[in-house]
Amino acid sequence: MKTGGLSDFADFGEEDANCTQGIQWIKDVFTDCVDTDLKLLGFIIGLISLALWLIPLFPQLWQNYKTKKCEGLSLAFLFFWLVGDTCNMLGAILTNQQPIQKIIGVYYIIQDLVLWTQYGYYLKIYNRPTTSSARSNTIVVPVLALASVGSFFVFESALPPVGDHRVKRSFLESLNHQEGLPLEGILKMWPIFTSYTDMLGYIIGSMAAVCYFGGRIPQIIKNYRHSSCEGLSLTMFYIIVAANFTYGISVLLATTSWLYLLRHLPWLAGSLGCCCFDAVIISQYYLYRPKTPLAEDTERAGLLNSQDDSD
């Protein structure tokens, strides 16, 4: 392995394509070129982030099950989270990522759908009787998302297999070989994107980052209006902060050029930006948590002492 360093735009494509000094199994499984000590450290931290991302919803799901309530969750927060995970999933399919990345994308969506199911059940069915129309309004979003993901798998499996004379090529892949398209000048002007498929994956990744980033705002507003974070799992947000922070660090450690940093900017901003918003939610949790009798007595004594001093 060689030592790491930040270089210019020109070396990105060559280094990424060859990876002669990298660890081969990492490139085969994760398509990452790990050929420096810093990249190896970043890859290890990235694996930690990946492991953390497998479990963040479990504390919230368990709390919902124990309390039989989901009122503390903002519906907009859940919606943006589901849309963000769906965008990640579609991006992995459209850019033909490794199977492990597609499987993880499906896993995220399954977790989201379980959370949506809990939300609909405990809010609309468990605690009070409801009509079928009200139930359908609650579950329509996850059902549509699941149908969309399923349709992409059906479409992908319906494509002809690779053979001696037949090549399985999607519409997006065929676009990469077209000449004279309006966006061709953009690809040649500045080598941020290597193909139209690559550009579409970047756009979808940016949409996911915006959903993750902006989805926190409705939850923060709801906590502020109710002066309460009851129903939210503090453990979930701690895990999310740790996962986002370790992911951001892994990207920064793997950076070898300004172009690499620019290509990963949406995901980097989405992860580190979410840390800031999640820190606000965590601070709200401690600010709005119910006071213990001892704390109330101490606060009351302090007020009485201040009144005596003023007299």
Curated annotation (Swiss-Prot):
Record GO terms (molecular function): basic amino acid transmembrane transporter activity; L-arginine transmembrane transporter activity; L-lysine transmembrane transporter activity
Location of the protein in the cell: Lysosome membrane
Membrane-crossing residue ranges in chain numbering: 38-58, 75-95, 103-123, 139-159, 190-210, 234-254, 267-287
UniProt keyword Transcription, yes or no: no
Any one Gene Ontology BP term: positive regulation of autophagy
Gene3D superfamilies per UniProt: 1.20.1280.290
Record InterPro entries: LAAT-1, PQ-loop_rpt
Membrane topology qualifier: Multi-pass membrane protein
Family to which the UniProt record says this protein belongs: Belongs to the laat-1 family.
Record's function text: Amino acid transporter that specifically mediates the pH-dependent export of the cationic amino acids arginine, histidine and lysine from lysosomes. May play a role in the degradation of autophagic substrates in autolysosomes by regulating lysosome function.
Protein name: Lysosomal amino acid transporter 1
Source species of the chain: Caenorhabditis elegans
